[in-house]
């Protein structure tokens, strides 16, 4: 997409925030496909859980074709293995190995695009934002460690880290902290618990329980974004990795619908008195009353 700019040539720093959502996070891949087709490039990316995996791949400079290939072939067996532990059913160390083997770079310092992954400190309940330095694969693993299913991940400071979705499932404020002036957020859980039937696995039960606790925080983060995409994936469960093609298409449809709004935000609006771009959200543009 051609970005318009004022006579200084400056453009807003564009950020992308990707939510967690287990298999539903594959919808992020479809959105990236449309962004890639339009030549849209992000200056910084933040992701939680599944969003950290997809966002990390994007920030690493991985070609989109490879991201899509991974998204369509990814299975639960790639992410974890059964383990003997009182703290979880599986270890997701395999996910760390998977990422390290496929990403073009392995450390935050080497990423061509600034990136942050969010985890949760199990002892304090605080968000742990991993950025700037350290191991990207480890950060993604920690961000994806669904509590109760995966064993918590212990970092170099002795903190037990679990899925960032507990405290920041849609990390809009995190990508703002990376310097984003315009933020596109993708929330794959907007439709909540609407799906066909009850959870079909322990993972589904755990993820749905997390979603209930996330709703207030996510609603606030949605308000902080300039454009929010909500792919229509509510009829598919969080554990249905085999429906990758449907998740990806849902993400692509949401991105196509959002492209006009994104384009408008990146255009200069001198008549608005804001210089080189218009930050007003479409939902705030109401006709004036007499």
Pin down the residues of each PLM region.
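Patatin-like phospholipase
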Residues: 1-48, 56-290
């Amino acid at each position: 997409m051609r970005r318009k700019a004022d006579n200084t040539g400056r453009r807003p720093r564009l950020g992308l925030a990707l939510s967690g959502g287990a298999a539903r996070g594959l919808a992020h891949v479809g959105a990236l496909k449309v962004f890639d087709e339009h030549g849209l490039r992000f200056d910084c990316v933040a992701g939680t859980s599944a969003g950290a995996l997809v966002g990390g791949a994007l920030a690493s400079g991985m070609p989109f074709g490879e991201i899509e290939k991974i998204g369509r072939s990814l299975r639960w067996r790639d992410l974890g293995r059964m383990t003997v532990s009182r703290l979880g059913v599986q270890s997701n160390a395999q996910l760390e190995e998977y990422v390290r083997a496929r990403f073009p770079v392995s450390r935050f310092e080497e990423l061509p695009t600034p990136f942050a992954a969010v985890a949760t400190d199990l002892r304090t309940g605080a968000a742990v934002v991993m950025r700037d330095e350290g191991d990207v694969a480890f950060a993604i693993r920690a961000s994806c460690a669904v509590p109760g299913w995966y064993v918590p991940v212990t970092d170099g400071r002795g903190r037990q880290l679990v899925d960032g979705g507990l405290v920041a499932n849609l990390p809009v404020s995190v990508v703002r902290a990376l310097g984003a002036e315009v933020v596109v957020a993708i929330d794959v859980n907007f439709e909540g618990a609407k799906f066909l039937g009850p959870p079909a696995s322990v993972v589904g039960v755990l993820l749905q329980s997390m979603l209930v606790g996330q709703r207030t925080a996510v609603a606030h983060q949605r308000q902080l974004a300039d454009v929010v995409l909500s792919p229509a994936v509510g009829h598919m469960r969080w554990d249905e990795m085999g429906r990758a093609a449907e998740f990806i298409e849902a993400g692509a449809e949401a991105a196509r619908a959002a492209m006009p709004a994104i384009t408008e935000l990146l255009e200069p609006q001198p008549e608005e008195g804001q210089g080189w771009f218009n930050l007003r959200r479409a939902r705030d543009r109401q006709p004036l009353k007499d």
